[in-house]
Amino acid sequence: MKRYIIGLTLASALTMGLTSCSDFLEEPIRGQQDMENYFTTEEECEKQITGCYNFIACDDWWQIYKFYNLCNITTDDCWMGNTTQDPGEYRAAAMFTGNTIDLGNAVQNFWQYRYKGITQCNIAIEKIAQLKFNDEKYQKRLIAEAKFLRGFYYFELVKNFGGVPLVMSLKMPSEVQGITLATTAETYAQIEQDFKDALADLPKKAELSANDIGRATSGAAKGMLAKAYLYQGKYAEAEPILQELTCRGSHASGTPEYELMDDFSQVWNIDYNNGKESLFEIQTSDDTQYSLGERYSVLVGSRDDAGWSWGLPTSNLEKAFKDAGDEIRLRYTILHDGQTDVPGDPTWNEENPYVISASKHKSGRCNMKLFIPVNRRPSPYDAPHNPLNIRLLRYAEVLLMYAETENALNHDSEAQWALNKVRQRVQLPEVTATGTALRDAIRTERRLELALEGTRLDDLRRWKMDDGKTMMEHVFGPNGTFVKYNMEESTDPYETTNQQENSNEGINFQAPRDLLFAIPNSEITMSNGTIKQNEGYN
């Protein structure tokens, strides 16, 4: 008889996505326990929820962070960067080749590990509900956490692939074969329902114990639900939730649960993990007994500073900061070759400037948001022990979502308030524009405030321009603004001289193909062809 197996370790996960059949085993494995005898205590239920969280980032760089970086590279904010090694799937993504094989394992790993997380959540939702808890409120909270995380995992999938298979219960291999894609609308409907269900039973951030900091909260669920609405253009549905979070308009009550950090320098500072601006973060630890830290910082760091230099900021992004007069955010977003005053790190000075050498890097810039000061790095630095939490949703983005929503609903005074709240922190003048000009100002603000945080690709794909085309269609392609800038306007000494990475990046972009990633070929094969490839891929 086939039996489902679940591990007993702290961050256990049922390692089975849509393509992982080897975890359905006939016999128990040593150190593991089959599910028929599990979920008999509240402690076992808690461990299962821990397993649900584990798949947010997993335990190394290649499962999730490689894909996150690929998403940045597929925008006007980042080059591939490393010009000394074969970029592999990064080249296929950045050059928009349309070849599903060349996309390699970054996309496949992301797909599979998101479904492994979904599987963990499905198990938790089903099994925890069957156990009698002494504290029914706590039982509901655990189920709510699983629903929040399932909604999060599906949200990450639909943004990148469109409609995906909706797996809402544990599946045997025979049930996976023949599975089909849900529509994008159907996928979003499930995401919305999960976030709605979750927020009803999740605590507020202020109600969390010290040991629970970082777990899902009602505020995180509201923020993610509002974001899901916004990405679909459901502004009327997003508005009341964003009003609750900002305490504005007809849904205002009391004072906001979240605030902006006092200074932009604190937002990605290692000493301000889970700060007052944070709605949801990937939690990390520098405990060397476990792989619970992050290696994203190493992945994007300078090759002259023990990094791998994949995903380097473009001069086009830097120009956007300078055009806006935004010196503060530029300083805490982009680290430059030759810099002698690196924020938070006295290692670098006039005698020992920071190095991002032109021979190894397409750009003389690195991601400052993920920079780890030398005296805070683990040994070895490239081990998964960096304790910088990855900010997934913060209050500044909530304010900008509110600004975008109110502008779309022709409530420009409210949109101005939210936009200027973000600008005040970085000492930029108030925006008084209305209508389309205000819309464009909000879009620029999102690029600057959230630069290198993984939102740019989402925005380029979803924002419509006045001609009805997406912004991504205006940025890329033979006549795209980013392509023309690099081929005709840029005088950047790094980008123009190091042609190991070609400056015509993005010239091959095609819509609608490149508005989504290709579904991994392995998933299509496993489904016996009932899962269909996204349009335009070969």
Predicted regions and their residues:
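Conserved, well-structured interaction surfaces
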Residues: 46, 50, 54-62, 84-161, ...
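Long, intrinsically disordered, low-complexity segments
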Residues: 24, 71, 78-86, 100, ...
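Structural register within alpha-helical repeat arrays
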Residues: 143, 150, 218, 225, ...
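An aromatic- and glycine-enriched ligand-binding surface/loop that stacks and positions planar moieties
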Residues: 22-87, 164, 188, 196-199, ...
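Flexible, polar/acidic helix-loop-strand segments at domain edges
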Residues: 87-97, 277, 323-394, 537
